[in-house]
Amino acid sequence: MIKDILNRYGKYMILGLILVSLPTLQSMGLIRSGTLQSFGTIIFYGIVALGLNVLLGYSGLISLGTAGFMGFGAYMSAFLTMEMGWPFILSMAASVLLPTAIGVLVGLVSLRLSGMYLAIATLAVAEIFRRMFEEFSFITRGFRGMSSEFPSFFGIQFERDQTFVFMVLLLVGLMVLTDNFIHSSVGRALLTMRASEAAAQAMGINLLKYKLTAFSIATAYAALGGILYAHFVRHTSPEVWNLMLSLQILAVIVIGGLKTIMGPIVGSLVVFGIPAIILPRLPVIGGVPGLAMVFNGILVVVVILFYPNGLVNIVYDIKKLVLFIVGKGKGKEKVAK
């Protein structure tokens, strides 16, 4: 049984162990403080992309409202903890549940659409949220934004390193949860619906029910990512939650790999990690404004043209190549004997 668990979830555990070690490496001076901050960004955007991948990768539905629901979760959690004095656990639960409930209501209307019409409808919802963040200044502080603090649990105030480890544990837990969901009967129904809605209906699958399920998961993950953003970055403002962010998260799952669990994490590392950690240190071009956008745009085109299955599959292809070469070498040895 343990062997089966390790075979299925071992890669998620290894990822978690690597990430958990980063605060220790930073305290030893082996990595920079800014690098740890960048990996925090990779984690919460990876969580958001994991939810969007359920919607797009497994259900075939596209949403451009991701940033709006992230912002909703971020603002709500910051307001409840800083202004209302709620414990972090309660504010996190409420800040996931309310955006998810709103997402279900939005889905009841918008999920009767498909393709670009659905994308435009979800984009409109995100823009409504963004305008609310700007105009409802008596709650959101308008363009100044809202400040928040690292989370606290049962009276224990976390600092940045403890918050980072908490986010890693959440990430690994959600990867395991999503893996189980995808391999459940609901996950199989989503894949059937993605392949052919007509065939799914013929099999008795309630399309609206399963579309709402996928949409609510994507919304919940987006809200959770926004909460983690608010309490790790410790500030949220309207200009963060724009269309560009939704497109970047969409790029994450395209680059990382659709219909995979590790793909969103790989994509988040590439889309958010490389521009923050590596590109600024490049000679000559490192300080060019907009370099990250150019890099991500080129990479999306390259991946779509030459590696449509996503960068996460490179590891498996390299493994196959090595096994092929090793096997070929052994074959030659036998012939020589």
Please report, for each region that a protein language model flagged, where it lies by residue.
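Transmembrane alpha-helices and adjacent helix-loop boundaries
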Residues: 1-337
